Amino acid sequence: MIPKVILYTAVSLDGRTAGFPVDMGLFYSLAQQWGEDASLVGCDTLLNAPDDIPDDRTSEVSTATPSTDDSRPILVVPDSRGRLRSWHYWREQPYWKDFVSLCTQSTPREHIEYLKRKGIKIIKTGTEHVDYRQALEELNGRFGTAVVRVDSGGTLNGVLLRAGLVDEIHILIHPALVGAISPNMFFRDPNPEQAGEIALKFLKSELHSERCLLLSYAVLK
């Protein structure tokens, strides 16, 4: 079974995801309404975090296990190339109860061993690129994940949309125009030459803080 996948993004009025101040308090307070079991966060999103996070070069082994009655979601990060070496930092954050790295058959063996030392769960699908359909099925089977909220940039959003895996899209529009300052769009098609329409059904619109508009759509499949 594939979990319900919710794509939720903060954008400027012209659809950019960077180059303007995001109301983070409002963004994450609204995110609570979907009761996510897993936060699917793009690897680049974590690598580009504003904090100066050093790579973990220690050989320390983590044995921490989540409580069975912990209602927090799990953090899921696709990282087929083994680029994320700051799991020690993300494990210390209070937002998630458990941690999963999505890998492939080509993920470096040394990185797989690093993940095991740090107590990071591993889901391995695909050869060069993560097979997201299979990964979502395994999230449901292994962790009981019913709702996944995607917190990422346009590349991962585009891959999931084109694979037909997204159920709902929620866009929090901020009162700003970015223009040429940022090329980052909330939907970047993985194969523009074969791009086509993705049909949506309007669900609702909500005005928040008298400045931000939340638009909600269902993806027609």
Language model feature labels by segment:
Residues M1-K221:
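Enzymes that bind and transform nitrogen-containing heteroaromatic metabolites
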